[in-house]
Amino acid sequence: MATAKVVYASMTGNNEEIAEIVEEALESLNVGVETTEISQADPADFEDSDICIVCSYTYGDDGDLPDEAVDFYEDLKDIDLTGKVYGVCGSGDTFYDDFCKVVDDFAAVFEQTGATKGSDVVKVDLSAEAEDIEHLEKFVSEIVAKQSAL
């Protein structure tokens, strides 16, 4: 059975909800899942999983990493995830110019780790609506299919 590690950062609860949607979608595809809040996670935990997923929000007017995600983000740069499949999703507010910038930032760091991109990023405006849930389920299906093909 394939395994997945889902790490999330959530201030308002929106990304925790997104992580739960992702977790349920993975479980429905018979993937073993462990979900952890980012301040309690270590990027090295990804080395023990087939699938690596980050769900994060973007903080402030300048598209900053959440404070609780900075160490995880920096440490992720030093991990070799060759042979793993990754995905990044998260919520933000389209009011800001840097809507979901951190989602793109995490995707760029995953590229540096040698991991294989499983799906395009998913960006959710505020909280997940029905259409967003469909996008997240497709995101998970694509990641699992990519992992199965390795």
Regions found by a protein language model. Give the residues of each.
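Short polar catalytic/cofactor-binding loops
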Residues: A9-G13
